[in-house]
């Protein structure tokens, strides 16, 4: 780790070992000495070209820190940030977390919470009203959150929401079937080999 008065230069290449014994290597994009936080730009974990992962490391929790290559030229100017877009993303994330917290505190079943998340991926205009899911202020889905529990004016909105609910529970059933199959398959193999 950088000693008192030592800093990591922006653009330097650094290698370190995390507390989970993972070796990381990347380019320094920021370093804050008082908080001992180091931001490294590493190759993208998705493998996509022209993408990178930015990792924030607390130097109190890493070891074997070594500078592989010091930056010899002046670093490029920092990229501009779209503050409006970031604020909007943060606001939406906060609203989503508050909605999840509300559902949990209201005692909504796990099926209801999962259905809400599925609907919210397609239709952002959905909210909780006690234990009911309200979609586009037109469709109300009450517990136990099945297709027959969808109420609203006949029309495209109700039909669309019913299709989403139907597909959600069909996908859940298929997922349960996939999880059960390996066990059933191994039991068949055991009984036929005996």
Curated annotation (Swiss-Prot):
Pfam families named in the record: AD (PF09793), LSM12_LSM (PF21166)
Compartments it resides in: Cytoplasm
Keyword Cytoplasm: yes
Start and end residues of each Sm domain: 1-71
UniProt similarity note: Belongs to the LSM12 family.
Role played: Nicotinic acid adenine dinucleotide phosphate (NAADP) binding protein.
GO molecular function: RNA binding
InterPro entries: AD, Lsm12-like, LSM12_ABD, LSM12_LSM, Sm
Comp. bias regions, Polar residues: 176-194
Gene designation per UniProt: lsm12
Entry keyword set: Cytoplasm
Residue stretches making up the AD domain: 79-173
Entry protein name: Protein LSM12
Species assigned in the record: Xenopus laevis
Region annotated Disordered, chain positions: 175-194
């Amino acid at each position: 780790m950088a000693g008192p008065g030592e800093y990591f230069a922006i653009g330097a290449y650094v290698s370190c070992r995390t507390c989970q014994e993972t070796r990381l290597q990347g380019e320094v994009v920021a370093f804050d000495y008082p908080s001992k936080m180091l931001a490294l730009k590493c190759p993208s974990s998705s493998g996509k070209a022209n993408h990178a992962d930015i990792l924030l490391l607390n130097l109190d929790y890493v070891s074997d820190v070594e500078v592989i290559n010091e930056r010899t030229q002046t670093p490029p100017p920092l990229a501009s940030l779209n503050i409006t877009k970031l604020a909007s993303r943060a606001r939406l994330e906060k609203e989503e977390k508050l909605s999840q917290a509300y559902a949990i505190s209201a005692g909504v079943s796990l099926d209801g919470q999962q259905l809400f998340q599925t609907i919210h991926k397609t239709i952002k205009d959905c909210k909780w009203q006690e234990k009911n899911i309200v979609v586009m202020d037109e469709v109300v889905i009450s517990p136990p959150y099945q297709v027959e529990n969808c109420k609203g004016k006949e029309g495209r909105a109700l039909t669309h929401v019913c299709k989403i609910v139907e597909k959600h529970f069909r996908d859940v059933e298929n997922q349960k079937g996939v999880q059960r199959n390996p066990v059933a398959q191994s039991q068949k193999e055991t009984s036929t080999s005996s």
